[in-house]
Every structure is written in C-alpha cells, then in structure tokens.
Amino acid sequence: MREFSRTDRVAQQIQKEIAVILQREIKDPRLGMVTVSAVEVSRDLSYAKIFITVFNTQDDNAAKQSANVLNEATGYIRSLLGKRIRARIMPELKFLVDNSLMEGMRISNLVDSIIREDNAKHVADETDVEDSTDHEDDVTNSEDETKHVDIDTDSEEGTNTDGKAQ
C-alpha cells in the first residue's frame, strides 16, 4: 500500500497554497491572523473543508467572522488556487473554525492551575508537618531534661552523695 493516498497529497498541497494565498493575496481588514490548520478533501476531490485558526483573539465571534469572510471570498480563493494547482477538478471550498488549538490551550491552562494549587497545598502541608515535628522535639527535650540526674563525680567510689556506703 502507498504511504500517502492521493487525497492526502492533494489536501497537503491545498493547505500549503491556501496559506500562501491568505498571506499574500487576501487583504481584508476583517480577517485577523488566520492560519490553515488542516484540510480534509473528499474522496472524489470535489469538496474541501479548510480548518482555520485565528490568533490574537479570545473572542469566538471574531474567529467565526473570519471564517464567514473567507467563505464569502471562496470563489476568488478558488480561482487563485486553480492557477496554482493543476487539477482536473478544483474542489469546492468550505472554511471552518478549528477550535482544537484553543481547547488545547484552555485544557493546558486548567492543568497548570491545578498543579499550582496542588503545589501550594503540599507546601502548606509540609510547613504544618514541620511545625508539629518541632513541637514534638520540644516535648522530647523537656522529657530528657526531667530524667537527667546529676551524679557527683567528686565523691569517693562506693559511696553515695549523702556519704553512705553502697
């Protein structure tokens, strides 16, 4: 079996050429920083879904507006694409917003915040444990002090400190 099917090769070529067209040919102020993230082509090469991502915007409406602008300019983009790609059939183009990048960033931020909260919780737990072990050491030291009995080393062997024989 071949490594890549014809539809995959056509999709890659369309992705590359549309990215260049968007960068150099389309001058609409309503478009943000649009990039082509993926292209899916039907088996008969008559339809192509172009997934776009819009950078520098957190607003979902701005991304949808960019997709609408590109869908309005589909005829022009398709004619430019036809000049760049030699194909018997030029697919009908449909621009769709790709939310996977934004979802990935949102999930990554959630994971990062959970890790920060967990680390802060562990730091707080460790300081509580250190405080309790310091308190236990204080109790142990006070017990050692009460058990300590002074022995008079100056007295003679075999006699207690009160002078009685052992």
From Swiss-Prot:
User: What InterPro entries does the record tag this protein with?
Assistant: KH_dom-like_a/b, RbfA, RbfA_dom_sf
Which compartments is it annotated to reside in?
A: Cytoplasm
Its keywords, alphabetically, are: Cytoplasm, Ribosome biogenesis
Keyword match Membrane:
no
Biased composition regions of type Acidic residues, renumbered to the chain: 126-143
Looking at the UniProt record for this protein, which Gene Ontology cellular component terms does it annotate, in alphabetical order?
cytosol
Q: Which GO molecular function terms does the record list?
A: ribosomal small subunit binding
Spell out the family assignment given in the record's similarity comment.
Answer: Belongs to the RbfA family.
Record function comment: One of several proteins that assist in the late maturation steps of the functional core of the 30S ribosomal subunit. Associates with free 30S ribosomal subunits (but not with 30S subunits that are part of 70S ribosomes or polysomes). Required for efficient processing of 16S rRNA. May interact with the 5'-terminal helix region of 16S rRNA.
Subunit relationships: Monomer. Binds 30S ribosomal subunits, but not 50S ribosomal subunits or 70S ribosomes.
Please state what the protein is called: Ribosome-binding factor A
Protein source organism? Pseudoalteromonas translucida (strain TAC 125)
- Give the organism's phylogenetic lineage: Bacteria, Pseudomonadati, Pseudomonadota, Gammaproteobacteria, Alteromonadales
